[in-house]
């Protein structure tokens, strides 16, 4: 689990998108950072991010000519989907050594799962890369992204845990998780 998870406090979740249910779903959206996958192919990226489902999502740039396009988005999924993709018993083989029997199905709103602190810091820094803490991407991320409990925003979580933003990633992920 990349040597950054904190199992004792269930701080090992990553970040994904899931559908918004209800009346507002047709007009909903969020602001995110786009990045090019230059060092390897999209297939390499999909293989690395093994625990997700993926979709191509429409986007509109906020600045300049407001170009539109499509980008690959990581989606929440199910244990069955992961096992279908990687083979029966994959979760047990890969994550069982860490004491986990599930990647998705056991981690609902009442599970107590929290974001991996080093990864969360990386996401927050990335969101603020353009515009800082007052930038639209940063504000959208901290105000419109929720923990697994579906109630607590990233902003509220960081207010309770400000030390997260002071954590340095270990050498094994320093370049990748530095915002």
Model-derived regions: residue spans:
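Glycine-aromatic micro-motifs
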Residues: 1-179
């Amino acid at each position: 689990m990349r040597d950054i998870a904190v199992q004792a406090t269930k701080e090992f979740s990553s970040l994904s998108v899931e559908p918004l249910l209800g009346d507002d779903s047709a007009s909903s959206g969020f602001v995110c950072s786009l990045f090019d996958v230059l060092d390897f192919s999209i297939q390499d990226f999909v293989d690395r991010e093994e625990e997700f489902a993926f979709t191509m999502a429409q986007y509109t740039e906020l600045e300049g000519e407001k170009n539109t396009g499509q980008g690959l988005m990581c989606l929440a999924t199910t244990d069955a989907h992961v096992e279908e993709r990687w083979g029966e018993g994959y979760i047990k083989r890969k994550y069982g050594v860490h004491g986990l029997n599930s990647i998705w199905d056991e981690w609902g709103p009442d599970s107590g799962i929290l974001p991996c602190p080093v990864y969360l810091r990386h996401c927050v820094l990335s969101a603020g890369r353009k515009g800082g803490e007052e930038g639209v991407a940063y504000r959208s991320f901290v105000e419109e992204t929720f923990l697994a409990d579906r109630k607590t925003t990233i902003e509220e979580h960081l207010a309770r845990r400000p030390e997260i933003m002071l954590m340095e990633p270990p050498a094994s992920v320093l370049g990748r998780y530095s915002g």
